[in-house]
Swiss-Prot record:
Cystine pairs: 28-72, 32-48, 39-59, 45-66, 49-68
Primary localisation category: secreted
Official protein name in the record: Floral defensin-like protein 1
GO cellular component, as recorded: extracellular region; vacuole
InterPro entries in UniProt: Scorpion_toxin-like, Scorpion_toxin-like_sf
Pfam families: Gamma-thionin
Protein source organism: Petunia hybrida (Petunia)
Biological process, per Gene Ontology: defense response to fungus; killing of cells of another organism
Keyword Disulfide bond: yes
pH-related activity note: Stable under extremes of pH.
Function: Plant defense peptide with antifungal activity against F.oxysporum and B.cinerea.
Propeptide: 73-103
Reported modifications of this chain: When compared to other plant defensins, the petunia defensins have an additional fifth disulfide bond.
CDD domains: Knot1
Length: 103
């Protein structure tokens, strides 16, 4: 009896963790549209991003671009699965390249 209660508690906890993980919003990145120089300092980059209606910003580590961030709201669009997969692969490739260069 004690084992089944323990198992049930662990199962409920695991379900709650998975539900919370899936509910977390993704972070979208885009270059600041008005930035035209090399990004060295984060403070002006954040100001540029806030002006462009983003929530935050930072300088990219490799190319020194001003990247703005905000929470993504994905809606069902008419994009095909191939287009979505291609965008995900490109984003992942950029992240891996940036991570490899910093190691």
């Amino acid at each position: 009896m004690a084992r089944s209660i323990c198992f049930f508690a662990v199962a409920i906890l695991a379900l709650m963790l998975f539900a919370a993980y899936d509910a977390e919003a993704a972070t979208c990145k885009a270059e600041c549209p008005t930035w035209d120089s090399v990004c060295i300092n984060k403070k002006p980059c954040v100001a540029c991003c806030k002006k462009a209606k983003f929530s935050d910003g930072h300088c990219s580590k490799i190319l020194r671009r001003c990247l703005c961030t905000k929470e993504c709201v994905f809606e069902k669009t008419e994009a095909t699965q191939t287009e979505t997969f291609t965008k995900d692969v490109n984003t992942l490739a950029e992240a891996l390249l940036e991570a490899d260069m910093m190691v």
